[in-house]
Amino acid sequence: MHHYPDSAVLYRSLTKDFPLAVRGEGCWIHDESGRAYLDGVGGAYVATLGHGVREIAEAIGAQAARLAYVNGTQFTSEPAEALAAELARRAPGDLDHVYFLTSGSEAVEAALKLARQYWVESGVESKHKVLSLTPGYHGNTLLALSASGRPRYQTYFKDWLVSVPRVPAPYAYRCACRGEGSCPACTGDALEDAILAEGPETVAAFIAEPVGGSSTGATVPRASYWARVREICDRYDVLWIADEVLSGAGRTGTWSALEWYGAVPDLLTMGKGITGGYVPLSALHVPTRIADVLAKGSGSLMHAQTFSHHPVLCAAGLATVRYVEQHGLLERCHRMGTLLHQKLEVLRDHPLVGDVRGRGLLAGIELVQDKASRAPFPRSARLTERLVEAAMAEGLVVWPNTGHADGANGDLVTLAPPFVVTEEELDEIIRRLLAALSRLTTDD
């Protein structure tokens, strides 16, 4: 095991031991001792293709040997042009231009800045506010963090963050209507209420994840929700930014999660699975009607990043989207996702499990102290952390989240295995997760 301060690495956690990963194959990660871990969440919702796909590695190497780097202010490149065309072809509606960056946070930051620049260049400088869902998450750069409904992540930086008015998320399990009624949060009317409260003339954009990520444990809004959001944004001239960094690139069984809803946003971000995790890459989709305003005004998006439009990263993305298409992985994700959700139903009988939900190969398991009242455990119980540790002891990797119930309390874990997961591996995920849950009840 490796830990701080014995290593020169400043780890993501300075209080835990890390196994040293040395090899990956399919849905499995192997450490230096030879132990295999079933990667039930693709690292961080990233490893869509599975580990060890030679075609992606070879595409990266070939491009690095041919042309490793050019700056986006001076040149374009074949991989950037080809990948942008492929992504535009797959994107919903008129999102026909793509700006490449290297992380989801950067893509969100660029989208928010573009929204503001668009209104200024359109002569509507009063539009400067961004609205977002809570709970919700959009990244760790300061503007993206400001838009995130994750109080714990903001604790040390509150003085640096901008004020972002909050809209209650369509979080059916935590809503009094349980997703079946006409409450403003679940219908989308809460967005209109928030816009009117702030003043439509001041609201530039609304940002949200089409299917909930880790913040709400894969919550799926009702079928009419995003059409209602589109209607509201059109009525009040608000740009709708769809954050598909997590839910996009096929994770829900379609390339964009919004395909399930038939709604088209004004801007859309993607990341994580766009390269299957082989290199860092993210994308901001922009329609011509917005890009034209900049082209006829200042002439550029006022957002710079040294590695934007990087040819090697774009080559990896191009190889990934072609691999997904050639191997039918969207259809496979949908099919295996249906199986996963069928198999997860057994967890509902466990005394700690309050809800199981999701879409495609994205699933959330919410843990509660009392099923009838949906009361969460107190944060002091560290239930999520203990479950993650128990799962690792069983050789299963899952993703944790806390605080979603009321801003402080709440426990859930999410699953997002690679699209190449087999039915036998799905069974193994369920078996190991149940064993980890049993460790908690036995310990208690």
Regions found by a protein language model. Give the residues of each.
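Conserved N-terminal phosphate-binding loop of PLP-dependent enzymes in the Aspartate aminotransferase
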Residues: 1-444
